[in-house]
Amino acid sequence: MNRLIAKTGSIIVIVTVFLFAVFLMTDLVFWSYLVCLILPIGYIMMTVGFHHERKGENSSASLLGVLFAAVYAVLIMLVYYAQLTAVNLGGLNEQAAVLLDFRRGGLIFSYDLLGYGMMSLSTFFVGLTVRGKSKKDKILKYMLIIHGFFFFPCLIMPMTGIFASGMSDGETSGSGVMALVCWCVYFIPIGILSFLHFNKNDD
């Protein structure tokens, strides 16, 4: 059951990140928000699978991975549920829209980046615990650890005000879309390699 949950989580990660890239490129904003709401569920399921494998060895690092995943999930689900409800349904005044509309680059956008910063920390600590002699497991380990360094730009860039000035009109920039698509291209293999990792053995 433990590996089934982890494999299911990996599949959710693969599918949601792929669909996120597709919806970004086709400008289907509502659907891109919807899959972002689902992604944290799969990611937590996948992360708990890595933690279960440790069974005492390196369990502190894997537990940190799970805890940061939980913080990520809370932040991201609040961000995108707000987009799908309060923002999508309309009726917000200008001040509320600046704060809550993701595309305006305000507070809610900063929370989104903070959430993905927490995800980055999660992947870093999970990556430290991945064991396996196969080439695929080694690639997975280093991809998770490298992804952890995204924590720093996710944390620092919103403090510079670069997004608030560049997104004040509420329009999504082409460079922003491409950056997110590049992230998707990087993260989909993590989901695939995680599935293959969990699929090697059964409980």
Task: List PLM regions with ranges.
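Hydrophobic, aromatic-enriched alpha-helical segments typical of multi-pass transmembrane helices
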Residues: 1-203
